[in-house]
Amino acid sequence: MIKINISQNFLVAKGHALFAEKGKDIVCAAISGIIFGGVAWFEPDKIEFTENKLVPSIALKLIDPTPNVAVAFSVITVQLKAIANSYPNHIVINEESYE
């Protein structure tokens, strides 16, 4: 199962979806595509991004959350939630309150 922790300025995704065998897992591919596609949009000085293929995990932290950066991060979050709603046995999202 992929576990995703999301806050106002960061997200961490860990694990495998285990929807299908390695290389054919559409759920893992969707999550990776959303996160890596989002990362490609950000200017490098606006974020910190790390990937660990051994664990596996991906972490994204906003360094300079300007309004445009915040909107882009929200889009990533909405997309991840859509996949989680479609595949609840393979993805769980925990949101930290930021009020």
UniProtKB/Swiss-Prot annotation:
Under the heading InterPro entries, the entry gives:
Peptidase_Prp, Peptidase_Prp_sf
Q: Name one Pfam family in it.
A: Peptidase_Prp
Q: Does the keyword Manganese apply?
A: no
Write down the EC number.
3.4.22.-
Which SUPFAM superfamilies does the UniProt record give? TM1457-like
**Source domain of life:** Bacteria
Q: Give an example GO biological process.
A: ribosome biogenesis
Q: Does the keyword Transmembrane apply?
A: no
Q: Which UniProt keywords apply?
A: Hydrolase, Protease, Ribosome biogenesis, Thiol protease
One GO MF term on file is: cysteine-type peptidase activity
Per the Swiss-Prot or TrEMBL record, the active site comprises: 16, 28
Q: How does it assemble?
A: Homodimer.
Family, according to the entry, reads as follows:
Belongs to the Prp family.
| Protein function | An essential cysteine protease that cleaves the N-terminus from ribosomal protein bL27.
- Spell out the protein name for this chain: Ribosomal processing cysteine protease Prp
Taxonomic lineage is: Bacteria, Bacillati, Mycoplasmatota, Mycoplasmoidales, Mycoplasmoidaceae
What gene, per UniProt, encodes this protein? prp
